[in-house]
Amino acid sequence: MALRRIVLQGEDCLTKVCRPVTDFDNRLHILLNDMKDTLLDSGGVGLAAPQVGILRRVCVVQNENDEIIELVNPEIVYTQGEQTGLEGCLSVPGKFGVVTRPEVVRVRAQDRDGNFFEVEDSDLTARCFCHEIEHLDGHLFVEHTDHLLTEEELQEYIRRQEEDEA
């Protein structure tokens, strides 16, 4: 298990456009393995390569069934609907905002061996696909919210969500 340091907001690599992966080799496999280990250790639901200082189009997403999906050279090919909800980021610790994303997202990507595939999901996983792919283009979720929640506002938002679900 190899954990990588998570890059924080303000560091240059989070604002750069990542280059596509062209070599599907052992270095890529090590990166993906390390990213999965780092994601699981962090308690997050997604991690993009620039968040560990690597400017390549690679990300990992943990879906709502706790499966980790590896996405190499991902692109969003279809969206449907809209959802608005709370979002945070491992590279922006302690900060949360309300962000609107598509409800359903289909992604075309390659696996660690270069094989193309498509994956479609909704809700939190769809939100995560969008969030992580934006990292590959040098963007952070804070660009989509005009207000970062204070700790008090965050707790109030969570309380209201729980009441709505009850």
PLM regions: where:
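Active-site rim/adjacent substrate-binding subdomains
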Residues: 1-130, 135-166
